[in-house]
């Protein structure tokens, strides 16, 4: 299987599993928690059909990548992404992040610039800053909320995932119509196959402050979010994000949950392909 080495922990290398398909302008898809690059399958198919080269990879600790105990912060995640781009020598690339993956996009552009990047897309994003503080009243939740997630993951991450996906896909509304029990089970299996250290550390990255990164986004951008998102509510994320980046193309998908890559794939793909074609 194809891997890119991004670091070392003691005697073992830290390797990222990736896939690279198609020809044309490269589109790099960066997955969310607690999934893997395979969560993009409905977008990958549409992008390949439209003539793009599609690269997916599993973030450290997730999917088929190595499961180190360290490196779970956005500076390291962005450095890992930079290694992927440099190793594959990608030029004129489009970075597309979903959920947690939007953090890599913002931090990469802020830290490494856009010499290799043509466009960026933020789908169901966590920007600009999820933590509710005195200087950030638009934040989604206080510190105690995120501490509770970490505690739940450490206590029994498998039980946590079951509850997490209920609201990830809004199963009370979409199960049996927009998503099958089997697809939900696959998401759970993917989450369970990831590393414990990654699962426990990831929630502490969600409240990273990206407010200083946003002004450095100097290429065309897309912000797309579902109005029914219970995981990252739109009023705390995309709508505030768009005010900070008014030049971005902005799309709201009516009623879509957080996991809209699957439940509302047609709407997502239509908006993404239109953005790429401009």
Swiss-Prot record:
It comes from the Bacteria. Signal peptide: none annotated. SUPFAM superfamilies: alpha/beta-Hydrolases. One of its GO terms (molecular function) is peroxidase activity. Keywords: Antibiotic biosynthesis, Oxidoreductase, Peroxidase, Plasmid. Homotrimer. GO terms for biological process: antibiotic biosynthetic process. It comes from Kitasatospora aureofaciens. May be a chlorinating enzyme involved in 7-chlorotetracycline biosynthesis. The lineage of its organism: Bacteria, Bacillati, Actinomycetota, Actinomycetes, Kitasatosporales. Its EC number is 1.11.1.-. This is Non-haem bromoperoxidase BPO-A2. It is an enzyme of class 1 (oxidoreductase). Residues 26-264 form the AB hydrolase-1 domain. The active site is at 99, 229, 258. Belongs to the AB hydrolase superfamily. Bacterial non-heme haloperoxidase / perhydrolase family. The gene is bpoA2. Disulfide bonds: none annotated.
């Amino acid at each position: 299987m194809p891997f890119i080495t991004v670091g070392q922990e003691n005697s073992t290398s830290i390797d990222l599993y990736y896939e690279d398909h198609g020809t044309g302008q490269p589109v790099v898809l960066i997955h969310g928690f607690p999934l893997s690059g395979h969560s993009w399958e409905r977008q990958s198919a549409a992008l390949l059909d439209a003539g793009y080269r599609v690269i997916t990879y599993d973030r450290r600790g997730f999917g088929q990548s190595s499961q180190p105990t360290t490196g779970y912060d956005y500076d390291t995640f962005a450095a890992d992404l930079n290694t992927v781009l440099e190793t594959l020598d990608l030029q004129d690339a489009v970075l597309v992040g979903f959920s947690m993956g939007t953090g890599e996009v913002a931090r990469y552009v802020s830290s490494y610039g856009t010499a290799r990047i043509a466009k960026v897309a933020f789908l169901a994003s966590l920007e600009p800053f999820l933590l509710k503080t005195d200087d950030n009243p638009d934040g989604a939740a206080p510190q105690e909320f995120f501490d509770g997630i970490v505690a739940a993951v450490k206590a029994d991450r498998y039980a946590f995932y079951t509850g997490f996906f209920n609201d990830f896909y809004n199963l009370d509304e979409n199960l049996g119509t927009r998503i099958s029990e089997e697809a939900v089970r696959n998401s759970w299996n993917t989450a369970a196959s990831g590393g414990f250290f990654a699962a426990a550390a990831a929630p502490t990255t969600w409240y990273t402050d990206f407010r200083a990164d946003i002004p450095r986004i100097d290429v065309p951008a897309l912000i797309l979010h579902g109005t029914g998102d219970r995981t990252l509510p739109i009023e705390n994320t995309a709508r505030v994000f768009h005010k900070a980046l008014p030049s971005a193309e902005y799309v709201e998908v009516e009623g879509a949950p957080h996991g809209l890559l699957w439940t509302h794939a047609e709407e997502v793909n239509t908006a993404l392909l239109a953005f790429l074609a401009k």
